[in-house]
C-alpha cells in the first residue's frame, strides 16, 4: 500500500502525471483540477495515493494534500 508519493514532477498530461522518485517514474492518475493545482514541472510535489489492484490492472490514483 502506498500512502503518498513525494518526488520530482516530470510530466503533466490531461488525466495523469509522472513523478520521479529515486529514478523510478510513477504514473499517477489525477483529476484535471488536481493536476492544475499540483505545481510546475521540475518541482518537488507530494500526492496522497490510492493503490488499486485488479485482475487485469494496477493503477495509482493521486489526490492533492
Regions found by a protein language model. Give the residues of each.
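Conserved hydrophobic positions within beta-strands
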Residues: 7-9
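Long, highly charged, low-complexity intrinsically disordered interaction regions
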Residues: 2, 11-65
